[in-house]
Amino acid sequence: MAQVTQELKDSGIASGLTVGNQAPSFELPHADGTTVNLKTLLENGPVIVIFYRGGWCPYCNLELRAYQRELATIQEKGATLVAISPETPDYSLSTKEKNELDFYVLSDVDNIVARQFDLVFDMPDYLIDIYKASGLNVDAHNGNEDWQLPKPATFIIQSDGTISFSDVPADYTERVDPKTVIEKL
């Protein structure tokens, strides 16, 4: 795992959109079966968008639960919280239920939106082998055989679509504290 993290750091790939960029508009399926449109959400105020690898990732689950604990504060500040992974809607629903999440959990199958945010990388063969040997079938979770993941990332998108905060660490174990994100709203 440390090797792939170092390779991502060294390569500079999937560095993510930065502050001042316009966020790509998107419409994705929610775990509850509805469709969520970013433009519609932005009509109500800023949107915090979290990209995570999948419900199989323990770091992602910790992050999602941390945001759930801060959800009332986020909503008091007039913001909406959205979490996006490449997992199929069924797996997104499992993640939502397992973590008791009361915010949008969206499926970006094929990483279409994550790619627009410049977050997607191809998993190296040695990492695929490790995951397979441990019984983790990322391709089954994602509904394809691409073996691609988004780097975990957090963005604040203002009502005009401008990104006002961007955190895209190369190390998937490093996540920005939700309280820091709330301070930036």
Say what each PLM segment does.
Residues 63-116:
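Structural microenvironment flanking redox-active thiols in thiol-disulfide oxidoreductases
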Residues 1-22:
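N-terminal targeting signals for export/organelle localization
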Residues 29-31, 157:
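A generic structural motif
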Residues 25, 47, 153:
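Conserved beta-strand and immediately adjacent loop positions that scaffold enzyme active sites
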Residues 15, 38-40, 145-147:
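Short secondary-structure boundary/capping segments
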Residues 172-185:
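A short, polar/charged loop-to-alpha-helix boundary motif
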Residues 38-67:
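Short active-site neighborhood of thiol/selenol oxidoreductases, capturing the structured segment around
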Residues 108-174:
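Thiol/selenol-based redox catalytic cores and closely related redox-interacting motifs
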